Amino acid sequence: MSAIRYELIKKCKQSGARLGRVYTPHGCFDTPAFMPVGTQATVKGMSPDEMKEIEAQIILSNTYHLHMRPGEDIVKEAGGLHGFMNWDRPILTDSGGFQVFSLSDLRDIKEEGVTFKSHIDGSKHFISPEMAIKIQNDLGADIIMAFDECIPYPADYDYAKKSLERTTRWAKRCKDAHRNPEKQALFGIVQGGMYKDLRQQSAYELLELDFPGYAIGGLSVGEPAEIMYEMLEVTVPLLPEDKPRYLMGVGSPDYLIEGATRGIDMFDCVLPTRIGRNGTVLTSKGRIIVRDAIYARDYTPIDPECDCYACRNFTRAYIRHLLKSGEVLGIRLTTWHNLRFLINLMKKVRQAIMEDRLLDFRDEFFSKFGYKKI
């Protein structure tokens, strides 16, 4: 029996979007959903209670970083991630593949796995598909990911094909190594670069392995938005209707809405926390850099339409002052706001799906935010 169950509640008559709910051992979450990223078993600047206040239903943690520090053995002793970080709602862990291929000084990719140098101290490490699953079994998240190879953009066709076929073999090894399928759902990850036929090949090969959910990886890595949408349009229709679909590493408002219109259920990204730390905030009328001098005497909220703690209590002028003074509260408030903005955006997306008006909502939002339709 699978650790999770996907319930399809409604299909949007105006688009390919769907309203759903995913049930896990630690409760359910509504889809389409944005998952805040807690890389080091914490969403930067936010406590678990604050994450609940902004209505985060599920968060993501990072296998690579937790393996490096403090080590999965410590997390397991503490009662898994849920006990370690005192979070009683669903958690998803990535496999560490993306970090191994992007952060580390790569040494060698072989069929057995990947040898790499730590980004912390330069020490040499090896991760195989079996090890990635063992680490995630110890971390204890509700949803875990197969170990995949993340190729750069651009990549030539032959390498993309060779890589996706290795990713399929690794996915089978991950499934064979998984020791806790009744408590942790293992998702396969579709790869294939920016080639339609390779994306289709990857999807078909993973479908044969019958995972409880499917992710689409290797997108939003520098390619034009039109290409990402093309890859979604050839991949998503191949994925099972009765299982969740997860677009990895995507979190800008336009990508969230466009992904939802194409049938994606789950998204994650560090964008809201990362840009918040740099003084950039998302508003219903577009991004603003609140630390800029223009806001020194702006006594309005970050976004008058937002209901978050920062917008209910503080002004742009005050938050700018905090950021310019190097006060931690400034970063906390911009982070709080950005996370709430995206979580609330997904609530509006779900409501628009329920009312069969997602494309209308998209057009209205894009017009106010300053996006162009592609």
UniProtKB/Swiss-Prot annotation:
GO terms for molecular function: metal ion binding; tRNA-guanosine(34) queuine transglycosylase activity. The keyword Thylakoid does not apply. SUPFAM superfamilies: tRNA-guanine transglycosylase. Its cofactor is Zn(2+). Pfam families: TGT (PF01702). The active site is at 94 (proton acceptor), 268 (nucleophile). The keyword Electron transport does not apply. Substrate binds at residues 94-98, 148, 191, 218. It catalyses: 7-aminomethyl-7-carbaguanine + guanosine(34) in tRNA = 7-aminomethyl-7-carbaguanosine(34) in tRNA + guanine. GO terms for biological process: queuosine biosynthetic process; tRNA wobble guanine modification; tRNA-guanine transglycosylation. Residues 249-255, 273-277 are annotated as: RNA binding. Zn(2+) binds at residues 306, 308, 311, 337. Keywords: Glycosyltransferase, Metal-binding, Queuosine biosynthesis, Transferase, tRNA processing, Zinc. Binds 1 zinc ion per subunit. GO terms for cellular component: cytosol. It comes from the Bacteria. Pathway: tRNA modification; tRNA-queuosine biosynthesis. Its EC number is 2.4.2.29. Catalyzes the base-exchange of a guanine (G) residue with the queuine precursor 7-aminomethyl-7-deazaguanine (PreQ1) at position 34 (anticodon wobble position) in tRNAs with GU(N) anticodons (tRNA-Asp, -Asn, -His and -Tyr). Catalysis occurs through a double-displacement mechanism. The nucleophile active site attacks the C1' of nucleotide 34 to detach the guanine base from the RNA, forming a covalent enzyme-RNA intermediate. The proton acceptor active site deprotonates the incoming PreQ1, allowing a nucleophilic attack on the C1' of the ribose to form the product. Homodimer. Within each dimer, one monomer is responsible for RNA recognition and catalysis, while the other monomer binds to the replacement base PreQ1. Belongs to the queuine tRNA-ribosyltransferase family. This is Queuine tRNA-ribosyltransferase. It comes from Acetivibrio thermocellus (strain ATCC 27405 / DSM 1237 / JCM 9322 / NBRC 103400 / NCIMB 10682 / NRRL B-4536 / VPI 7372).
